[in-house]
Structures are given as structure tokens and as C-alpha cells.
Amino acid sequence: MAQVAGKKLTVAPEAAKPPGIPGSSSAVKEIPEILVDPRTRRRYLRGRFLGKGGFAKCYEITDLESREVFAGKIVPKTMLLKPHQKDKMTMEIAIQRSLDHRHVVGFHGFFEDNDFVYVVLELCRRRSLLELHKRRKAVTEPEARYYLKQTISGCQYLHSNRVIHRDLKLGNLFLNDEMEVKIGDFGLATKVEYDGERKKTLCGTPNYIAPEVLGKKGHSFEVDIWSIGCIMYTLLVGKPPFETSCLKETYMRIKKNEYSIPKHINPVAAALIQKMLRSDPTSRPTIDDLLNDEFFTSGYIPSRLPTTCLTVPPRFSIAPSTIDQSLRKPLTAINKGQDSPLVEKQVAPAKEEEMQQPEFTEPADCYLSEMLQQLTCLNAVKPSERALIRQEEAEDPASIPIFWISKWVDYSDKYGLGYQLCDNSVGVLFNDSTRLIMYNDGDSLQYIERNNTESYLNVRSYPTTLTKKITLLKYFRNYMSEHLLKAGANTTPREGDELARLPFLRTWFRTRSAIILHLSNGTVQINFFQDHTKIILCPLMAAVSYIDEKREFRTYKLSLIQEFGCCKELASRLRYARTMVEKLQSSKSAVAHVKASA
């Protein structure tokens, strides 16, 4: 019987009944709404669905006594019938419960009933670096340093405790509300029992698999260094080093060490990647060597990052800040194209190469072509006409948008369109195609000129040429506070907020039945007037969020809707969306208010 530190994992005998026989628990049991730990008598309320992976489903769970919120990983015992499955689960729990580090997902206990095993973990609300990567592709060098430093710190702790993670990848590097990295998912992890032990077997396929694992030569801590090399490459280049469309070809490239680093990558960064991706595991740096590399010692590492970095690049003003904030002049960013990290005129970052233009640039149509293609493919399969529709299987909460428009007011006959984002920041797209945004602190401002050049100011210090626009912005903000929203107190500024950049409203138009809004991060939102339903489309995540008449907010992957189908209501809105995206794309000037009627 599998055992975790004196506590057995039991699988009820009836779970082994063959399928199709009445009473067989091979039919998936309903997960209870209240989860009870029989040992401590703690009770948890099962809340929002967070996602699924492997055998497990993950939910937000709330301790009914302390009101603390956790992530509950729930595994049906029907999936733990074979000894190796049970042993794997036992090992995962045993390893994770032995760990306690700032950059490792916190373990808060586990328990079971007849049907499920429940693991109580730290909740990471900002998902993982995988979603960030899908939205951002390549990140700026200071951001890469920030995420890598924390990942290495967590991995140092694992290695010092003789744990090899064996599946370090973007999807297993989770982010909390403070944008701190937490290493999670110890399903493939193992413990080194004695010095020099080489592990021979590995159940499962790691994402960034090292050549010595493929060669079955025995492996150890060096596999995690290889994975960190792949992570660093992916963060800076925007795609994994050995990626091909065919797994066999990818493995061949790994074995041959066949990859190339684009010329625009800083040579210091390229050198560190090359060291970590050496075929010979003994010639790779150890985890303790990494943070002493020039890449980390010579470059700027932000102490905090704003959550806006999940979808748009940050602005780097001063590293570290030495100027009294009250004396700072408004900072104006040099416009280098929308996807380049913004350089501010006042102070340059530590290294010139940090600001080099990424190899790819954001498409001129802001991902409308991709969205059109995605919607065309989806609508072609007629998802609401399937014989069996299982819309809930298409749900993917990890793809939930970072920003959407929560309120808007149309004054375009005189001034422009005012709107509020879900984080309570407020913006106006003026009729002259300029934009002004006030952050949710009620003080910071972002001004975007017609040519997309961005400037950063505050309500206490701005050029007189902007006086009228700032007065109008405040008017819009007050109007929406009084008439359209629950007035909320200003949020307290936190460290890292000075690096925030918000997506802005790129273009919009109204039809008889809806308003269509296109944000600069690629998101398209359609609000339907009659029933107040909304859809929010993200081409980078290839996902749609649907807010129905009951104001329930659910996010689906478009590819999974193709596979599992969807209700007629969502299908008709997705057909309408395709027509609207086509209209957005064909408008000659997709940077302001498009006149339309449909």
C-alpha cells in the first residue's frame, strides 16, 4: 500500500469494478461541494474551476473557518488503481510536503475520501509563465532576469534538499498576485538517495527533456539546468530552442544539440544559454553557479513587476530609482514600434543591448488576421450542431483575459469614447485619435499620440497642451464612477507599479446590436445591447470569454469548442464576431472610431 510519511493512500475496493456494471465507480463521481478533511475536520468550500491536467482537476477552495483561499488539486481514485499510479501520487505528495520556500508552491495538506484524493496547495492567481509567454512571446531582458532569478532560487532550494524537479517548464512556473515565481507540479520529481546516484527511469515526458534522459544513460540534477536553459531561451527568443511540429524531429535535434540563437540576443545572454544547453551534463554549470553569471551580475533586475506585464511590455524608467518622485519630469518614451521594450528619454537602462529590438514585431493589424482565421475555422465546423455537446469540457480558465472593458460611455459626437478597464483604470480615445489613460491610483497618466508614441506623466505634472484632455478624462471618470460603477477607493500603489503600461483602446465602432472594441494587446470585445451579454476574444490565447445574461463569466479555448461543441447562443455570437473582425480588419484606418452599421 502506498504511504506518505506514515499516512496511507487508500483506494476503495469498489473502484476496481469493471466498467458498465451498475455501481461501478469507473463512471466519474461528482466532486462534493464541501470537502472535509476527516483527520483535522477542516471543511473547504469548492469554488471556481481553475483547470485540469493529467488526471487532476483544480479548483479554488476556501477554508470555511479561516476563510483562507487555496488551490485544491483533486484526483479521482479511479485513476490511481495501478501500483505505479499510486506510487507516483505518493511520491509527489511526499516530496511537496517536505518543501517550504518562497519560490516553491506552498503545500497545505492532503486528505481523501472514498472517491478522491485532495491536495491543498498555495493559490497562484496569475497562472503561469506559459500564459504570459503565449500573450507576450519574447519578453524584455530585465523581465527574463527577474523570472529566471526566482526560478533559480527555488531550484537551488530543491537541489540543496536532494530533489530533482525533472519537469521545469513555463507551465510549471506559477505566478502569485505579487508576480512572484512559484515552482509547482512535482509529478515527475525524484529524490536523490546518495551522492552520485544517476536516475535511470522517468515516467512521463518532460517538456524540455535533456539529451541524457533521451539516451537513457542515467541522469541527475543537471537535467534541471538544461530545462532552465530552455526556459531562458524561450523567454528571450519567444519560442523553445528545439521546437518542431514533429516530436521525433524535436528529439533528434536535442540529441544532436541542434539549435540556433538569433543575432539580436545579447551575447552575454547567449553565452549563458549555450553553457546550460551543453550536451555533456558534467560540463553544464551547477545551480549555484548560475546567479554568479555576468548575465545576472551586470544587468538590471527589477525588484518587482506590475501585473500589466502579463500582457504588455513594461516601461523601464530608472534602475534603481534614485530621483525623488516629486521632482521627476514627465517621461516620454521613444517610439520604436509597438513590440519593442520602451526606452524612456530621461534615463537609459544599464545596458544598451537590453533594449535591442526583438526579432519579431507585432503585426500591423494587431492580430486581427489570426483572430479571423481562428473564427473561420471554428465556425466552419458548426459547433452548436454536434450530436453531443460538452461545452464544459472546452473550458480553460487559464486563458481568462488580463484586461477587458468593464464600462464605457460614448461622447464621440463631441470628444470621444471613455472607458474603464477591469482594473479600474480609465481611458479616453479622443476624436483626434490620441488616447489618455489614468491608472487606478488616480494619479499616473499614459498619453498615446496618433503615431503610438507613449508618454508617462501624472496629474500633478503635465504639459499645458494636455490640460483640456486631462479635464475631459476626469469628467469621464467622474461620470462613470457616479452613473456606471460602484465607486471604489483608490488602490494603494505598490513597488513595481512605476513600470506598468496599460493596453489602450485601438479602435471601436457601434452597430445596431453591439459595440465592438479592439484593444492594443489584440483583445476584441463585443458587448451586445439587447441582452447585455459580452464576448472577449484573445487571438494570442486562441480563447473566448463569454459573459451570459446571468453575468456568469466563462473562458473557453476555441480549439476545444471545435472538439466538444457549444450552445447555440455562444455559436451565434462567434459567427457575428467573425463578421465584426472582418469589418475591423477592412477599415482603412484601424486606429480610431470606425463608422459602421450592421
UniProtKB/Swiss-Prot annotation:
Catalytic function, reaction form: L-seryl-[protein] + ATP = O-phospho-L-seryl-[protein] + ADP + H(+); L-threonyl-[protein] + ATP = O-phospho-L-threonyl-[protein] + ADP + H(+)
Cell compartments where the protein resides: Nucleus; Cytoplasm, Cytoskeleton, Microtubule organizing center, Centrosome; Cytoplasm, Cytoskeleton, Spindle; Midbody
PTM remark: Activated by phosphorylation on Thr-201 during M phase. Phosphorylated by stk10, leading to activation during oocyte maturation.
Pfam family membership, one: Pkinase
Domain of life: Eukaryota
Regulation: Activated by phosphorylation of Thr-201.
Molecular function GO terms recorded: ATP binding; microtubule binding; protein kinase binding; protein serine kinase activity; protein serine/threonine kinase activity
GO cellular component: centrosome; cytoplasm; kinetochore; midbody; nucleus; spindle; spindle midzone; spindle pole
Position of sequence motif D-box that targets the protein for proteasomal degradation in anaphase: 328-331
Region feature (Important for interaction with phosphorylated proteins): 532-534
Phenotype upon changing residue 128 to D: Increases activity
Region (Disordered): 1-23
Domain POLO box, first and last residues per copy: 404-482, 504-586
Broad class of enzyme this protein falls into: transferase
Enzyme Commission number(s): 2.7.11.21
Induction: By growth-stimulating agents.
PROSITE patterns per UniProt: POLO_BOX, PROTEIN_KINASE_ATP, PROTEIN_KINASE_DOM, PROTEIN_KINASE_ST
Residue numbers carrying Phosphothreonine: 10, 201
Outcome when changing residue 201 to D: Increases activity
Catalytic residues in the record: 167 (proton acceptor)
Region of interest: Activation loop: 185-212
Function: Serine/threonine-protein kinase that performs several important functions throughout M phase of the cell cycle, including the regulation of centrosome maturation and spindle assembly, the removal of cohesins from chromosome arms, the inactivation of anaphase-promoting complex/cyclosome (APC/C) inhibitors, and the regulation of mitotic exit and cytokinesis. Polo-like kinase proteins act by binding and phosphorylating proteins that are already phosphorylated on a specific motif recognized by the POLO box domains. Phosphorylates cdc25, pkmyt1/myt1, stag2/sa2, tpx2.
Family: Belongs to the protein kinase superfamily. Ser/Thr protein kinase family.
Complexes and interactors: Interacts with plk1 and kif2a. Interacts with fbxo5.
Record protein name field: Serine/threonine-protein kinase PLK1
Protein's organism: Xenopus laevis
Lineage: Eukaryota, Metazoa, Chordata, Craniata, Vertebrata
